UniProtKB/Swiss-Prot annotation:
Pathway: Carbohydrate degradation; pentose phosphate pathway; D-ribulose 5-phosphate from D-glucose 6-phosphate (oxidative stage): step 2/3. GO terms for molecular function: 6-phosphogluconolactonase activity. Hydrolysis of 6-phosphogluconolactone to 6-phosphogluconate. The keyword Signal does not apply. GO terms for biological process: carbohydrate metabolic process; pentose-phosphate shunt. Its EC number is 3.1.1.31. This is 6-phosphogluconolactonase. Keywords: Hydrolase. The gene is pgl. It comes from the Bacteria. It catalyses: 6-phospho-D-glucono-1,5-lactone + H2O = 6-phospho-D-gluconate + H(+). It is an enzyme of class 3 (hydrolase). Belongs to the glucosamine/galactosamine-6-phosphate isomerase family. 6-phosphogluconolactonase subfamily.
Length: 240
C-alpha cells in the first residue's frame, strides 16, 4: 500500500489532522473489535496531540494505550515518554489504570525489561511465540538522523526479526523499543514530523534508493496503512 503523505501549513493544522486520524481509527477499531489499541511516541511533536486527546469524549474503558519506545529512566524522570503522556493526556481522563501499559524500566536490566514487556504484549494480544500482534494504530516520530522509535542508524536493533521488543541504544544509553516487524504488523502507522531540521532525513526516506541502515524509518512498511503528517517546514521539499 502506497503511503499517504500530507504536508500541512503549520504544526497546529498537523495536530488537528492527527487528532482526526487517531480518533477515527480508534473509534473504528472499537466498533469492529470491541477495543482499540494505540502505541505512543515520545518527543515534543506529539505532546499537543495528547493534550487534545485529553479533551475528547471517548470510551476510555475500551482503549488500551502502549508505548512504542521508552528511555530507560524512571517514570518520574523528565525524559520519560510515559511521564509526558500521562501529564498531557492519560492523567486527565477517566481511563482505567489497567488499560495503560507502560514499558517497564525498573529491573536495572533493559534486556530483562524488554522480555517482560514482550511477554505482556503476547499475553494481551493472545499471540504465540514467533507471532506478531497487530496494533490498531502506532504513532511514530522522526529524528533528524532518520531514526524512529528507538531504532537508530547502524545499531543491532535494526536487525532483530524474531522479537516484539528489543533494546535500542542512543549514545550509550539503552532504550526499549518496538522491533521493525512488530511496527510493520500494524493496521495503521502514523508519522508526525515537524520542523525544517527533518528535511534531509525525509528526502532520503522518500528517495527511490537509500540505505535503510542509515535512515531506519525506511524500514517502516506496514501491512496496513502508512500515513505521514508533515508540517510545511518539514515537508517543504516533498511538495509535488
Amino acid at each position: 500500500m502506497a503511503p499517504q503523505v500530507d504536508v500541512l501549513i503549520n504544526k497546529q493544522i498537523l495536530i488537528e489532522r492527527a487528532l482526526v486520524c487517531v480518533t477515527t481509527r480508534i473509534t473504528k477499531a472499537i466498533a469492529e473489535r470491541g477495543q482499540g489499541t494505540i502505541a505512543l511516541s515520545g518527543g515534543n511533536t506529539p505532546k499537543p496531540l495528547y493534550e487534545a486527546l485529553a479533551r475528547q469524549a471517548l470510551p476510555w474503558e475500551k482503549i488500551h494505550v502502549f508505548w512504542g519506545d521508552e528511555r530507560y529512566v524512571s517514570v518520574d524522570h523528565p525524559d520519560s515518554n510515559q511521564r509526558m503522556a500521562r501529564l498531557a493526556w492519560l492523567d486527565q481522563v477517566d481511563i482505567p489504570e489497567a488499560n495503560i501499559h507502560p514499558m517497564p524500566t525498573a529491573a536495572a536490566d533493559p534486556e530483562q525489561d524488554a522480555q517482560t514487556y514482550e511477554n505482556e504484549l503476547a499475553t494481551f494480544f493472545q499471540v504465540e511465540a514467533g507471532h506478531f500482534p497487530a496494533f490498531d494504530l502506532i504513532l511514530l516520530g522522526l529524528g533528524d538522523d532518520g531514526h524512529t522509535a528507538s531504532l537508530f542508524p547502524h545499531t543491532p536493533a535494526l536487525t532483530v526479526g524474531d522479537r516484539l521488543i528489543t533494546v535500542g541504544n542512543k549514545d550509550g544509553q539503552p532504550r526499549l523499543t518496538f522491533t521493525i516487524p512488530l511496527i510493520n504488523r500494524a493496521r495503521s502507522v502514523v508519522f508526525l514530523v515537524a520542523g525544517a531540521s527533518k528535511q534531509h532525513a525525509l528526502g532520503e526516506i522518500f528517495a527511490p534508493e537509500a540505505d535503510p541502515q542509515q535512515y531506519p524509518a525506511r524500514f517502516i512498511q506496514p501491512q496496513g496503512e502508512l500515513i505521514w503528517l508533515l508540517d510545511q517546514q518539514a515537508g517543504e521539499n516533498l511538495r509535488p
